[in-house]
Amino acid sequence: MDNEQRLKRRENIRNFSIIAHIDHGKSTLADRILENTKSVETRDMQDQLLDSMDLERERGITIKLNAVRLKYEAKDGNTYTFHLIDTPGHVDFTYEVSRSLAACEGAILVVDAAQGIEAQTLANVYLALDNELELLPVINKIDLPAAEPERVKQEIEDMIGLDQDDVVLASAKSNIGIEEILEKIVEVVPAPDGDPEAPLKALIFDSEYDPYRGVISSIRIVDGVVKAGDKIRMMATGKEFEVTEVGINTPKQLPVDELTVGDVGYIIASIKNVDDSRVGDTITLASRPASEPLQGYKKMNPMVYCGLFPIDNKNYNDLREALEKLQLNDASLEFEPESSQALGFGYRTGFLGMLHMEIIQERIEREFGIELIATAPSVIYQCILRDGSEVTVDNPAQMPDRDKIDKIFEPYVRATMMVPNDYVGAVMELCQRKRGQFINMDYLDDIRVNIVYELPLAEVVFDFFDQLKSNTKGYASFDYEFIENKESNLVKMDILLNGDKVDALSFIVHRDFAYERGKALVEKLKTLIPRQQFEVPVQAAIGQKIVARTNIKSMGKNVLAKCYGGDISRKRKLLEKQKAGKAKMKAVGNIEIPQDAFLAVLKMDDE
């Protein structure tokens, strides 16, 4: 193909993604677009076609982004090439969304006709505007009995500033309005810029590991051309590889001769090491490199850390390999080795949020068959010590002694909640209970209020979202962003079993809540830890001071069962012997701690 043909082809390319709040029908709309462009044989069609992980189908959510090429014959007689990049909607996966948007020129904004605009919708709109994308608003689910398309149209105009007349009314389930959406994509989304004669610049926006072919990177070509046999260079690492295959996803992978300006496809270059094909990096040609890399996207830092330990210590190395493979297309995952007296060797792992943590844990157990114990999640604290030095703590067990610490800072987030009027009181009460600071309240219309609070991240990550949903009968939506670290009066609480500290059960708590949390936790552990042959004291301590204690009663074995009648001294001898045995057991006794006990640290607020 010569450059003239490439430029002509470029004019007919449209790259777009679909953004929406969770459950507003993104994946269903993607299915309909695939169906109506005849990209998928009817016999291969299934719901949530682009959600390729079993986990995504079971939970009904999108976790990974997916890119697919479609052909569309428009009413103007031209055939257009669409690249649809499906994105997740959950707040933990904002990073995936920002990666998808970096590869697009436009975005379909899907809003539920009954729910209207929600917190996540707005967050994604701001991301799209930051990337200078054209927005195509679609109101989905208009055939629902509770649908109010006119009200939602007004919301889109008032809150986002898009013209009502541009809004497409649709129902992805019933296949209404899909044709109009496809025509609008041609009209609204601009063709990609870029020069096929310039040095190659391609953005890696996703990558996955294939045990046979090595790393498969999803790329968006901005300038230049790439084909099999080219020698490419990664601009971040400077490493060079030979391209063995380039291709497109139709959702199946299909090799092609070349990828040129505006194309979205995949590239295989026998890259064996996960670190050599980092998401956000720029690929260029070794023989004619580009002068500077493309603007990547902002690196997301983990918000929540927890320890992952294999139940069987033999799996320690397998766990490392599993984490490395997951990290390949999940750049926000971080991990480093960690050892615990209670649990042996494992990894301290960083996540974007609790859903992200659950998903990774479940993927390791399913895809790699490694059984895990996870410790209670914790956020990152900054400690300024008396000698002026600074320490970062992401594991409560590593917190320095209280007398060495001058100040402790913890991360705060700005939380935006959209709630129906009736529940404002309940939501504000929840935020006060979570040490929140009221910032602002906005009545959007006569039904909904936008409430903004500053909250400690530690209070948000565990079960804030669940409690917010239950306090508002599921109507609230929620989005948060990190603002800064603030000084707090925090203490580390240790849990002692049988007089020994269990490092994996330590947690950091605000001094005002320390006594209640400690008392509630020891009571909870009493019910979760199996009874032993001897009595086990469970204590909560701050430094040397014990703030709460309870005992797990011993299992009584009746040593007198075989004594029928007989002398009292015989019975006493047996009881003394049992007592001595128990004392010895208590001295050397090892107590098995079940997984539920580690999670009990989180669930303290529910009591």
UniProtKB/Swiss-Prot annotation:
InterPro entries tied to this protein: EF-4, EFG_III/V, EFG_V-like, EFTu-like_2, G_TR_CS, LepA_C_sf, LepA_CTD, LepA_IV
HAMAP family: LepA (MF_00071)
One GO molecular-function entry: GTPase activity
Protein family according to the UniProt entry: Belongs to the TRAFAC class translation factor GTPase superfamily. Classic translation factor GTPase family. LepA subfamily.
PANTHER family: TRANSLATION FACTOR GUF1 HOMOLOG, CHLOROPLASTIC (PTHR43512:SF4), TRANSLATION FACTOR GUF1-RELATED (PTHR43512)
Domain tr-type G: 11-193
Primary site of residence: membrane
Keyword field: Cell membrane, GTP-binding, Hydrolase, Membrane, Nucleotide-binding, Protein biosynthesis
A single BP term in Gene Ontology: positive regulation of translation
PROSITE patterns recorded: G_TR_1, G_TR_2
Function description: Required for accurate and efficient protein synthesis under certain stress conditions. May act as a fidelity factor of the translation reaction, by catalyzing a one-codon backward translocation of tRNAs on improperly translocated ribosomes. Back-translocation proceeds from a post-translocation (POST) complex to a pre-translocation (PRE) complex, thus giving elongation factor G a second chance to translocate the tRNAs correctly. Binds to ribosomes in a GTP-dependent manner.
Binding site for GTP: D23, H24, G25, K26, S27, T28, N140, K141, I142, D143
Location(s), subcellular: Cell membrane
Name of the protein described by the UniProt record: Elongation factor 4
Gene source species: Staphylococcus aureus (strain MW2)
